[in-house]
């Protein structure tokens, strides 16, 4: 079923390149990543407010299969360089996801905040973790996606264009990842 949906989405993107607006072309992306930029799909990142240069790099990597996740590789395959820039610029203008309404567990928030400070996440991701240029916005990202991604950096199974996250995650204990993701997902 997922392959069928992906194939239909790819066909829609490829055939509509010249006749549809960017809003129409991005609709298949937002079906998984959230219509308003806030994903409701498990382990799927929210794209709202993401840095355009970061998104451009990720889309390029998916298109060229330098980053592998088959649905995304297929979706990005027909996109031209201009398409990648257009999609990235559009995504950057979608409002970033809001923090969850509940205040959260104070002890977990405190542990997560201490990890953010100790490992200086703000150095690359900005004090509000909004990201900059080719560094992603991680504030208010889906907690499950953050935990999965951080664990992949820690075990070196996620490779990007930059090895710095593997180095950052090396000293962080596996059991601390949940608190780190919990805090970052609830940034206020």
Mark where each language-model region is.
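Sequence/structural segment immediately N-terminal to covalent heme-attachment motifs in c-type
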Residues: 18-38, 99-100, 104-127, 142
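C-terminal capping alpha-helices of c-type cytochrome domains
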Residues: 77-99, 144, 168-188
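Protein kinase-like catalytic domain
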Residues: 33, 63, 125, 154, ...
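Gly/Gly-Pro-rich "capping" loops immediately C-terminal to redox-active cysteine motifs
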Residues: 37-67, 73-79, 113, 117, ...
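Hydrophobic h-region of N-terminal signal peptides that target proteins for export
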Residues: 5, 10-18
């Amino acid at each position: 079923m997922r392959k069928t949906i992906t194939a239909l989405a790819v066909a829609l993107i490829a055939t509509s390149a010249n006749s549809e607006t960017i809003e129409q072309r991005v609709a298949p992306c937002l079906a998984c990543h959230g219509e308003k930029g806030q994903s409701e799909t498990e382990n799927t990142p929210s794209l709202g407010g993401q840095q355009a240069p970061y998104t451009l790099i990720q889309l390029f990597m998916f298109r060229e299969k330098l980053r592998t996740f088959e649905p995304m590789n297929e979706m990005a395959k027909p996109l031209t360089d201009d398409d990648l820039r257009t999609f990235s610029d559009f995504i950057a203008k979608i409002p970033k996801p809001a923090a969850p309404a509940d205040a959260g567990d104070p002890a977990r928030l405190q542990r997560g905040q201490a990890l953010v400070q100790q490992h200086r996440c703000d150095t690359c991701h900005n004090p509000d973790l909004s990201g900059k240029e080719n560094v992603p916005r991680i504030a208010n990202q889906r907690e499950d996606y953050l935990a999965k991604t951080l664990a992949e950096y820690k075990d070196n199974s996620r490779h990007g264009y930059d090895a710095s996250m593997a180095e950052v995650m090396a000293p962080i204990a596996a059991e601390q990842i949940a608190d780190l993701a919990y805090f970052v997902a609830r940034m206020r």
